[in-house]
């Protein structure tokens, strides 16, 4: 805009200067007397305008030029004033400028995804630039925690608690889900190997290309097959016996699992805490159910409807 103002000012100043010097070029002094060395009767030279003559077509008068310059300067002031005003956006976020004065600007457009329960504290948030492919990929991993969605997690906990209930032990704890253990299991499951050297973990490798609802049923079937290797009162020695022993280990309270696709199979690993298969310890105490429920300091043990030990922390008194 400044370039156009300068260009028009220079362009319009040329005829204005010529009009001011007309008296000098026409051979007439400002007081009306003839200049020395000039012929008053001679015809004006080509390209020279007489002072008293009427402007020909295409020639601007001084008053017209002054009016145009005034209009141009007024337009320039209005444009500069409009550009200096802050632009209000929908978000209203402020960003400091180089002069230190906050100005309003529009931030990068973002898409916020939350899970179906819309609990950002648990699941966090994902900011995605407007790319449909990336959005679909992030949504799949966002809703599935460590390869397992909420229904599969619930099925794992419920079915393992059914196995623990059928044992009829005095001190059998009810298992609860732990996302912290699931994160640890996610590191092990990526190895895509069926060899399990961790006696506090259970694994399963099933022929299933996609992680679906049948994963839990097939895994439980494999784990129950290992019951034939279990011997109460004896330390587990093989992988099969140790896996079932860990499932019915009474002191274990929390579980976390993760699944990973490995070629045409699916591998799943579950970790328990407190860890089971401790040497020279019994997996559980036989007898009346819930007869010897234990709990952490400050919590109260209870017996639920499935005859499994539960515990809770009382609400603080204010």
From Swiss-Prot:
CDD domains: CAP_euk (cd05380)
Pfam families from the UniProt entry: CAP
UniProt KW Signal keyword: yes
This protein's record includes keyword Glycoprotein: yes
Domain SCP: 158-272
Start and end residues of each stretch annotated as Disordered: 27-55, 83-105
Glycosylation (residues): 21, 31, 130
InterPro entries named among the record's database cross-references: CAP_dom, CAP_sf, CRISP-related
Name of the featured protein: SCP domain-containing protein 2
Organism: Lottia gigantea
């Amino acid at each position: 805009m400044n370039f156009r103002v300068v260009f028009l000012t220079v362009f319009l100043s040329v005829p204005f200067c010529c009009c001011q010097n007309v008296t000098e070029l026409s051979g007439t002094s400002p007081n009306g007397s003839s200049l020395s060395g000039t012929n008053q009767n001679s015809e004006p030279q080509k390209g020279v305008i007489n002072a008293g003559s009427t402007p020909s077509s295409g020639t601007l008068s001084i008053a017209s030029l002054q009016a145009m310059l005034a209009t141009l300067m007024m337009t320039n002031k209005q444009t500069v004033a409009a550009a200096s005003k802050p632009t209000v956006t929908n978000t209203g976020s402020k960003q400091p400028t180089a002069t230190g004065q906050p100005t309003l600007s529009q931030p990068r457009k973002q898409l916020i995804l939350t899970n179906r329960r819309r609990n950002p504290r648990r699941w966090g948030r994902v900011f995605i630039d407007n790319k449909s492919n990336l959005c679909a990929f992030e949504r799949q991993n966002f809703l599935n925690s460590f390869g397992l969605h909420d229904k599969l997690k619930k099925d794992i906990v419920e079915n393992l608690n059914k196995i623990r209930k059928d044992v009829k032990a005095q001190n059998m704890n009810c298992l609860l889900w732990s996302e912290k253990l699931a994160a640890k299991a996610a590191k092990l499951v990526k190895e895509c190997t069926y060899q399990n050297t961790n006696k506090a973990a259970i694994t399963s490798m099933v022929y299933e290309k996609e992680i679906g609802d049948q994963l839990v049923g097939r895994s439980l079937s494999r784990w129950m097959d290992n019951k034939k290797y279990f011997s109460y009162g004896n330390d587990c020695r093989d992988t099969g016996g140790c896996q079932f022993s860990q499932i019915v280990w009474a002191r274990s309270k929390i579980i976390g699992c993760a699944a990973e696709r490995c070629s045409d199979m699916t591998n799943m690993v579950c970790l328990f805490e407190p860890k089971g298969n401790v040497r020279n310890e019994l997996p559980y105490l036989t007898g009346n159910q819930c007869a010897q429920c234990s709990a952490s300091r400050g919590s109260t043990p209870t017996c639920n409807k499935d005859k499994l030990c539960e515990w809770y922390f009382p609400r603080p008194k204010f």
